[in-house]
Regions:
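Fold-core signature of tandem repeat domains
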Residues: 9-11, 22, 27-29, 41, ...
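Residues at alpha-helix termini
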Residues: 27, 78, 134-136, 193
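Vicinal oxygen chelate
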Residues: 2, 5-14, 53-123, 141-145, 187-230, ...
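Conserved active-site tyrosine of GNAT-family acetyltransferases
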Residues: 19, 23, 75, 103, ...
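N-terminal beta-strand motif that seeds the catalytic metal site of vicinal oxygen chelate
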Residues: 1-20, 47, 59-61, 107-130, ...
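Conserved short beta-strand elements that form part of the metal-binding/catalytic scaffold
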Residues: 27-59, 105-110, 139-173, 220-226
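Structured core of small recognition/catalytic domains
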Residues: 126, 132, 139-209, 215-220
């Protein structure tokens, strides 16, 4: 389906001013209002990578595809359910929303800038792996370095490095991931700024450290740090 990777995210907040202050303090993110109640999000000195929407809709991890309508039909044939048909966002991108076979909400977009990682939590890893492999032509491999947990990495066709992963037995969710220099520092500052620590930090056998947090509005993230020289 010519899917590249996760290329956008969308978070929501009933108190967007508080949300913007949280991310500005945590990561220095910049918010540009595209229309009332909708802001694009960019890291310091970088292009837009996501959006903040006023409201209480579920956050979205958004996959960049070459053809939104065609991908939507393909996912429906695999058991996905359409939540929102293709329409233009205030940022101008064509976007649709589906639920995967575990009822995780995903976005499909016509454009975007790849984010560092994404993670799919599932209590049925077999069905989840099959869905995403058939949906986007990815392969999944067991991460043997992830000691004590069942974790799989996704690879896109022709890719040398994984683009995301499946965490088995961790409940059902679909969240974007952020590359950070110090996971414990991010989790600590998140808590002091009104967010919550969901898990971690934990490290695998290769020295990769991960953690999860939610912002004050409940938007959930994975964060990870690679070992020095990694």
């Amino acid at each position: 389906m010519n899917t590249r990777t996760v290329g956008w995210f969308e978070i929501t907040a009933t108190d967007p001013d508080r949300c913007r202050k949280f991310y500005d303090g945590l990561f220095g993110w910049e918010f540009t209002e595209a229309e009332a109640g909708y802001w694009t999000v960019a890291g310091p000195g970088s292009s837009s990578m996501g959006a903040l929407r006023s409201g209480d809709r579920d956050e979205l991890t958004i996959f960049v595809v070459c053809e939104v309508a065609g991908t939507l039909s393909h996912l429906e044939s695999l058991g996905a359910r359409v939540i929102a048909s293709p329409s233009r966002t205030p940022a101008g991108d064509l976007q649709a929303v589906v639920e995967d076979v575990r009822s995780n909400r995903l976005g499909l977009s016509s454009s975007g800038t790849p984010v560092a990682w994404f993670e799919i939590g599932t209590d049925d890893p077999g069905a989840t792996r099959k869905f995403y492999e058939n949906a986007f032509g990815w392969t999944s491999e067991r991460d043997e370095a992830a000691e004590g947990v069942e974790y799989y990495s996704f690879l896109a066709p022709g890719a040398e490095q994984p683009i995301g992963g499946i965490f088995a037995g961790a409940g059902d969710y679909a969240i974007p991931g952020l590359l950070v220099s110090d996971v414990e520092d991010v989790l600590d500052r998140c808590e002091r700024s009104g967010g919550s620590r969901v898990m971690g930090p934990v490290s695998d056998g290769n020295g990769l450290t991960i953690g999860q947090f939610t912002d004050p509005s409940g938007n959930r993230w994975s964060s990870f740090a690679v070992p020095s020289g990694g």
